[in-house]
Amino acid sequence: MVSPAWCSIALALLLALHEGKGQAAATMEQPASAPKGRGPHLRFRRCSCNSWLDKECVYFCHLDIIWVNTAGQTAPYGLGNPPQRRRRSLPKRCECSSAGDSACATFCHRRPWPEAEVTSSSQGPAAVLETSKTWTAAGDLLQKLRDISAAKLQFVRLRPELTREAIPAHSRRRKR
């Protein structure tokens, strides 16, 4: 004769397996109910870049890209499908999806890489590094950062004695 403890364990196991089977059947039915004629996944873009090599534009325009830092470069994933039409040959760096997006319009219709201008002043590089607390234009922060970088380069060129001298590499040959 079978003990009541074994019957309880067998009954609990049977109920657990039965519930698990029902969940597996429910998950198997979900993909079947999805429409099969569904087209490619479309991603929301703020604008469309003229060149995939312009990483700043791609980062600005494609809002749902996951950026992965690799050893030598930053690789964008999730760019979607290849373009279905010919490339445009426009002087602008991108084309906005919405005409009312003023931030997009200022980003897309300016030159791709504005050069930072080095201002030679009698006050020195420290005066160039001072910035105001508010910026008037959307790209003003980027311009200020480029000005700071240019001022640092100018400072290093004016004072070469402050830069470190190159340390000679260790010789691989054994000395006798």
Curated annotation (Swiss-Prot):
Disulfide bonds join 47-61, 49-57. It comes from the Eukaryota. Its main location: secreted. It is found in: Secreted. The record marks 67-68 as: Cleavage. One of its GO terms (biological process) is endothelial cell migration. GO terms for molecular function: endothelin B receptor binding; hormone activity. Pfam families: Endothelin (PF00322). Residues 1-22 form the signal peptide. Vasoconstrictor. Belongs to the endothelin/sarafotoxin family. This is Endothelin-2. It comes from Rattus norvegicus (Rat).
